[in-house]
């Protein structure tokens, strides 16, 4: 459970102690960090979401 790589303005740790702030993970673990907009019901593995936009490949 490696930490997510987040934007410089945010922090994200998907380890045992899950903490996410302004998270824009490039590797999203939905169970830990809600990195995609609320409209996304599920994050695809390895999806990349920027800001409030979410590509079709990100949501399943």
Swiss-Prot record:
A divalent metal cation 2 binds at residues 6, 12, 14, 25. Residues 1-28 are annotated as: Beta. A divalent metal cation 4 binds at residues 32-33, 43, 47. InterPro entries: Metalthion_dom_sf, Metalthion_dom_sf_vert, Metalthion_vert, Metalthion_vert_metal_BS. Residues 29-60 are annotated as: Alpha. A divalent metal cation 7 binds at residues 49, 54, 58-59. A divalent metal cation 1 binds at residues 4, 6, 20, 23. A divalent metal cation 3 binds at residues 14, 18, 23, 28. PANTHER family: METALLOTHIONEIN, METALLOTHIONEIN-1X. Class I metallothioneins contain 2 metal-binding domains: four divalent ions are chelated within cluster A of the alpha domain and are coordinated via cysteinyl thiolate bridges to 11 cysteine ligands. Cluster B, the corresponding region within the beta domain, can ligate three divalent ions to 9 cysteines. This is Metallothionein. It comes from Rutilus rutilus (Roach).
